[in-house]
UniProtKB/Swiss-Prot annotation:
Amino-acid positions noted as binding GTP in the UniProt annotation, renumbered to this chain: 487-494, 534-538, 588-591
Domain of life: Bacteria
UniProt-annotated stretches for the region G5: 624-626
Name of encoding gene: infB
Source organism of the structure: Porphyromonas gingivalis (strain ATCC 33277 / DSM 20709 / CIP 103683 / JCM 12257 / NCTC 11834 / 2561)
Family: Belongs to the TRAFAC class translation factor GTPase superfamily. Classic translation factor GTPase family. IF-2 subfamily.
UniProt protein name: Translation initiation factor IF-2
Amino acid sequence: MSIKLFSLAKELNVGVGSLAGFLRKKGFDVEDNNPNVRIENEEFDLLLTEFGKSLPKGEAERIRKKFVKQKQGTPASAPSAKEETAGMAAKEAQVIATEVPQDMRPRFTIKGKVETEKPAEPVPSPKDKEPDTVREDKPARETAPVKEETKVVPVKEDKPKEEKPKQEEPKREEPKPEEPVQAAPVAKPVEKPVDKPQQPVMTQKPQEAETPPPAQEMEKKEDTEEVFRLKTNTQEPQVKVVGKIDLSSINSSTRPKKKTKEDRQREQNDADGKKKRKRINKAAVDVKKEAAKVSGEQGKRNAGGGNHPSGNKNNNRPAQQQSNASGGRKNNKRQSLPPKVEISDEDVQRQVKETLARLTTKKTSTTLGRGAKYRKDKRDAASRAAQDAMELNSEEQHTLKLTEFVTVSDLSNMMDVPVNEVIATCMSIGMMVGINQRLDAETINIVAEEFGFKTEFVSADLVEAIAPEEDNEEDLVARPPIVTVMGHVDHGKTSLLDRIRNTNVIEGEAGGITQHIGAYGLKLPSGRRITFLDTPGHEAFTAMRARGAKITDIAIIIVAADDDVMPQTVEAINHASAAGVPMVFAINKIDKPAANPERIKEQLANMNYLVEDWGGKYQSQEISAKKGINITELLEKVLLEADILELKANPNRRAIGSIIESSLDKGRGYVSTVMVQNGTLNMGDVVLAGTCHGRIKAMFNERNQRVKQAGPSEPVLILGLNGAPAAGDTFNVLETEQEAREIANRREQLQREQGLRTHKILTLEDISRRRAIGNFQELNLIVKGDVDGSVEALSDSLIRLSTEEIQVNVIHKAVGQISESDVVLAAASSAIIIGFQVRPSVAARKQAETDGVEIRTYSIIYDTIEDIKSAMEGMLSPEIREEVTGSLEVLQTFKISKVGTIAGCMVKEGKVKRTSKVRLIRDGIVIHTGELGSLKRFKDDAKEVVAGLECGLNLAHSNDIQDGDIIEAFDEIEIKKTL
């Protein structure tokens, strides 16, 4: 038994890492970060025994049975079915093998006699040659051989011994399809040797009677084919094949009696010519006797129209072919059956059934019958093809054709599974993902398999199109480490970088929070270089942090000493550990009076991250980024981690790296921030990144200074791409621009196909669900931003705001200024345009005013999310709540013409307003709900009546008021719904 560790972890409700760690303690070699690793019986028993203790009673046994059933149930059943079919085939083969030799022996011995006796007889040799010449001419002359095939139908009944072996050997029927036609030519050679003496021929024919059978046998084969086709419809039981073998054995036993009848026929031929003709037809074995053929032709001439009725009665082929003699022969054969009855009653019944079966097939084997059979076969083939197509479609429905790095939302749409379930599955295997985060192939396989889908990646050829270059050991040189600063928002990530770089980046960020992923190169006083990546800490920038962890070598996790380990900090730690990146913990803000670094270390220890001060393996440093305390010590620890990793790269090769950010600059075009991971990037190189390509026109470092080349671990800003590649894409340097263009075009085509696959069409189920909800709303948004990472993060956050009643759709997202095309799209789809740190052009603003399209611009992601939330709350239908204001008792009723029933009431509690809605209650049952028609105190109209006072009133649209009824007054209050 071999099962995936991930499947067992899910059943035991234990993390994969815990199971792997336990197995390693027991001496098994198990990978820690691979949930797909398979375990055997011994490991399975150990895990179930150890972790099954905490399960409810009987749960461990249920899990054991489940996996044993999964692994043993299906494989065992399939082979057994094959073995049974093989066994049945073997049994049938054995039954046939016992009976076939008995049928084959007389046939082969007789054919051998024919060949030995032919050279001895000079007379039959010319006879044999003449039919041969006629046979060669005949097929060329005759255009309708079918008529002559059927003439020999009676012969099949007289010689059933040869039918059955032929059916057992269907391969012999195919090589000689034209020989049945040769049976008819026998009629012409008969005319030439008519004058020859018949008696010597008759004496020799019993032995030579087997020379013509090859032609007759082939005719019989076609007839037997018809019988065989009839039985092909019921071939499944395979019992009828055995029955045919038995019949052949019976017929072989009747064969010698036919020879004795020939002797009798010779005696009767001299006495009576009529009987002679009939019995010659009866002994169809001797059809090729020249004398018998002459008599057969005479019978045809004499029997002319008299035998037509018999042919019609039989409804067989001879009726169509003017073969009157054949009809007569069949009648004679039926009369000749009684002497055969002497053998056995059972044999007779079998033979009669076979004959009737042949006759019924003959009725349907007319020209019309053949057409019907052809149409039926065609219908059967069409139905089988349709069934196969349905099975293929069902398989295709459970096969996902996708490109690698599909987003979570696209994957959920293709599987028709809620996004939350996909995210929960990813979290169960230790991956923190967002809605718009792209997954790699291995993760997609795991998630799809969990929901019962198979995956087929259609972009594998494009990945292989760029062949990786191998580096020689002697070419590798040390490279600077890439360090990512990660942590919760406002915990001091950017302040630390400011202190290290002696700049002030925070002032340039809107709202004082980092909204872009920044890359900075730094040269230390010791001469060593470090590349820093600053990631956003806000919860919306999950994908950015994941990208930062993917391309980094070392992660600095910053935690504020006066705060706790916050959710984004935990998420950053998970990203770094999932990527296998070593971490250094920096406890910031120790200069504050409320700082408590020991509490932070305790919280980290509770998460299984022990720092070195507490006996663990993770380095930590207490710092103050604002005052510059212990910054040098922190950098030394980072360099120590880098020395342990032995980071190397080959600068003498074409560059490869990752896209950190991309944006659209009005003066410079599309600008991309890239991190070179290996090789050297030069001016003029042809770069391919995702679906974008181009030749580098200019390169700038993080201080906006021009550079001509960038080595490993250097971040640079490049100009020249024809679009804004997605953040996180890998870029490659290719030899020619044509090659880059071809690959980019194919990738773009695949991306469009992927978009069509993930486009979800509104189904009846969705419509019924919306009808059930009632007031279903859709909010369409177009998101434009300054950089790709911010657009992705904002779109992710906005889509997450969707509820059951309001669905948020980001119909378009892009980098750059808000243009006229965005306004046109928004007008067509009733969408709102969200601009994040971008402004609309003059033409776009005028177009928006004309079309009535709303454009909202923001600089801080918090404000954007809050505004969209409030807009969605305004779209929600308000919640209506009833508030009872008072109750009245009807003391007496008065009926007034043209007015209706007036009720004199006493207000028991609360007060009754003229505008209040009322409910009439009788014996605790609501009789009527409506509004007041009038409310009076004495003769004056009253706006309200308080408790303890009497009043008169009548109900609008109702006069059914009785003494003793209770009237309840209430107001409906609309309460604004919140998300």
